[in-house]
Regions:
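Exposed, low-structure sequence patches enriched in small/polar residues
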Residues: 40, 110, 167-169, 226, ...
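Extracellular/periplasmic, surface-exposed regions of secreted and cell-surface proteins
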Residues: 1-54, 65-388, 471
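Acidic carboxylate motifs that coordinate Ca2+ or other divalent cations, activating on Asp/Glu
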Residues: 432
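Extracytoplasmic gating/loop element in the C-terminal half of outer-membrane beta-barrel translocons
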Residues: 60-62, 187, 415-421, 472-485
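Conserved SET/PR-domain catalytic core that frames the SAM/AdoMet-binding pocket
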Residues: 438, 448-462
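Conserved active-site-proximal loop/helix segments of enzymes involved in bacterial cell-wall
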Residues: 312-317, 365, 435, 479, ...
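C-terminal beta-signal and adjacent terminal beta-strands/loops
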Residues: 219, 361-363, 391, 403, ...
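Glycine-centered loop/turn motifs
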Residues: 379-391, 414-424
């Protein structure tokens, strides 16, 4: 727990080489006056390698003989890893654009494909007997270590997505705006369950009020628009290579035979779910935006509500069992988003001042079944349960500190531990006259009530200087170290 170990002895013990190449090409064909066909290809390739050296670390400890303790196994070691990842996307889009009278229309149809592949291989060895590996980057290769101590690991996956989409934008008189979209996505992540495909929709509308005749005489108002939208989105991402088909792990062993012996074994890394499917988000928002004083002042406000259904999440294992993955429930997030910005130009000088604020109220609507909870955290302090914020802190409410033995005698009996003056005084939440595990309750929420930001900028000709500040408030932090047990 000595932070100076990391600062003094572990600094500069890793060497990395990272390379990345990305690019895109496209071809466009305009035909029949109102049609356009566009094909786009993009690729992103990354290659990352690292070598990490483990030194022998000794620290002072007055509680042991000689006052010196060697951390770890007392041996130097080297770890090497190599990772490559490729991402390839292709888009095929056909667009129709036309205007007649006071109407304008843009319609798009097409398809997209996305492919992602990752491979990683790593290995580690410690020093040979009596042969310390030098703290020299030129020597940080696993071939210098003892082959008998070799360990290795690997990680790999392939994933692809195919989508078909359509979108329509309609404008009447330059003031009434409508849009609608549809897409059908298929993901290889759910190919094992047969739930690869899912449909998603969205609609939206806007009214540019400032273009109406009854607002033309308001000289200080440059633009005023009311807007609203509703739509559905999908999520297939989980921290698993193949969410519907678990990989095998060799982190387990078993005892067989007479006489018994320990044999290495393989086990599913998590329980498969034959019904696993897309996570879906249904969202709507309504708001307004406006420009004032020759477009120098911009103000925008939106109320939003998002409901996540068929939530993709992992259920922790219990009593040595492996975890499970499933579509566990639904979550609601709602709040407001506000933004204001002032921008002006004075000769060669320009400046801008802006601020934004977002509020959020989070609640779990349902979770597997009534009364079910997901427990996580170093000390099982994070709970997720229907009717509460996601990941809320669960524990005992503190009413104060015991001052005297007399106060302890008059207080509800603490059955958790023997208390003395100076100990924390817990609240008897259920009122049964005792402090028990049944008195645990919600004591905090890790999700901030509000996030905010401030932007300052100044420019002179081709020179710019900007400052961005951000923060959050209304959330609690659970300190898992140096706390009451």
């Amino acid at each position: 727990n000595n932070p100076m170990v990391d600062v003094e002895l572990k600094a500069n013990t890793t060497r990395t080489e990272n390379y990345r190449a990305s690019g895109n090409v496209y071809a466009q064909w305009d035909f029949l006056k109102n049609f356009q066909f566009k094909v786009m290809y993009s690729m992103d390739y990354a290659s990352n390698s690292s070598r990490t050296y483990t030194p022998i670390i000794t620290v002072f400890d007055s509680s042991v003989e000689g006052n010196v303790v060697t951390l770890g196994n007392g041996k130097t070691g080297v770890r090497q890893s190599k990772e490559t990842e490729a991402k390839v996307q292709s888009d095929y889009l056909l667009t129709y654009t036309n205007s007649w009278g006071e109407h304008s229309l843009t319609a798009t149809a097409g398809s997209t494909t996305y492919y992602n592949k990752l491979e990683m291989l790593g290995g580690e060895r410690t020093q040979r007997v009596g042969l310390v590996i030098p703290n020299n980057p030129d020597k940080w290769y696993i071939s210098i270590g003892d082959a008998a101590t070799a360990t290795n690991e690997s990680k790999q996956w392939e994933r692809s997505t195919v989508s078909m989409l359509g979108r329509v934008l309609y404008n009447y008189k330059g003031r009434y705006l409508f849009n609608g979209s549809f897409r059908r996505d298929g993901s290889s992540a759910f190919s094992y369950t047969g739930n690869q495909w899912q449909n998603f929709y969205s609609i939206g509308a806007g009214w540019l009020m400032s273009e109406e005749e009854f607002m033309k005489d308001i000289t200080w108002l440059d633009m005023l628009k009311l807007k609203g939208s509703w739509g559905t989105l999908g999520n297939q991402n989980l921290d698993k290579a193949y969410p519907a088909e678990p990989l095998l792990t060799n982190a387990y062993s078993a005892v067989f035979g007479k006489p018994s012996a320990i044999y290495p074994g393989y086990q599913l890394s998590y329980l498969p779910n034959p019904n696993l499917r897309w996570e879906k988000v249904e969202a709507w928002e309504a708001g307004a935006e406006a420009n004032f004083f020759r477009n120098r002042l911009h103000i925008e406000g939106v109320y939003y509500q998002k409901t996540t259904k068929d939530l993709l999440a992992e259920v922790p294992g219990i009593s040595g069992t492996v975890p499970g993955i499933g579509n566990l429930g639904s979550i609601e997030n709602k709040g407001v988003e506000l933004a204001i910005n002032w921008r002006d130009q004075i000769g060669d000088w320009g400046y801008n001042v802006g601020a934004n604020l977002t509020t959020i109220k989070n609640k779990v609507l349902s979770l597997v079944q009534d009364g079910y909870s997901i427990i996580a955290g170093d000390k099982s302090q994070s709970y997720t349960m229907a009717g509460y914020p996601i990941g809320y802190f669960y524990g005992y409410k503190v009413e104060g500190v015991y001052q005297t033995d007399e106060e302890i005698a008059k207080s509800p009996k603490n059955t958790l531990a023997t208390v003395t003056p100076g100990d924390l005084k817990f609240k008897d939440v259920n009122g049964d006259g005792e402090i028990t595990t049944a008195d645990r309750t919600m004591i905090g929420d890790p999700t901030p009530d509000v996030t905010y930001g401030i932007t300052l900028g100044v420019n002179y000709k081709n020179w710019e200087l900007g400052i961005d500040m951000m923060g959050q408030g209304g959330n609690q932090i659970f300190r898992t170290w140096d706390n009451y047990n």
